[in-house]
């Protein structure tokens, strides 16, 4: 495919320079095509070409931060300390271990801590299997990031299944449960305490959706759930509306459980 654009078709700016107006429709050229710009004047004229959209295969800061190996080895070097990076969209997952406080009281710190630490390994494996990265642990909870919501939902299902199996072979496993919630949107990434961390309304909403879940459940925005073709082992069991702090309107949400745990 060839596209020929005469320089006379471009728009003059002040001072006699020539450039296309930003209001002009974008030029679409087939992959592998060639663009020719013909200058019929005696004077040289600069020509500038720009992509109006990000290249889908570009290695953006957000994309490389989602690689588990990168996050482990050099993630802290991605940003200067205190320098925020605005990302247009990231999917964030929060977990919580139900019953852990009572477990510490009933079996003691050592046994309870071992269960909590071991369950982190279970969650990490499930997250990384779907391209996610554990951003941080907070007490007995995990925050993880994903490039898109489909991966988050599938990881949530894998985590719930793996956690159920883990509890079946772990002392005191019957005393705890796992609940999850996820949400996607824009936020800020900063380097804090030698790791990358996320801040903003998306983080707050994701954490609050997790708070609406019960043991063995994952809570997702209904519109996001409907846009995902493959939910992994998760199956919808309920749709409900809830008022989430910081969000002006009530949200339509989906409550999901693993297929074998979902009611008929």
Functional labels for PLM-detected ranges:
Residues 144-263:
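Catalytic beta-strand-to-alpha-helix segment of the class III nucleotidyl cyclase homology domain
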Residues 76-162:
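Catalytic NTP-binding/metal-coordinating core of nucleotidyl cyclase/transferase enzymes
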Residues 3-33:
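Beta-sandwich interaction modules
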Residues 29-88:
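Regulatory cytosolic signal-relay segments
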Residues 50-57, 141, 191-195:
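Short hinge/gating elements
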Residues 66, 119, 138, 198-205:
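Helical mechanochemical/support elements of P-loop NTPase systems and associated helical scaffolds
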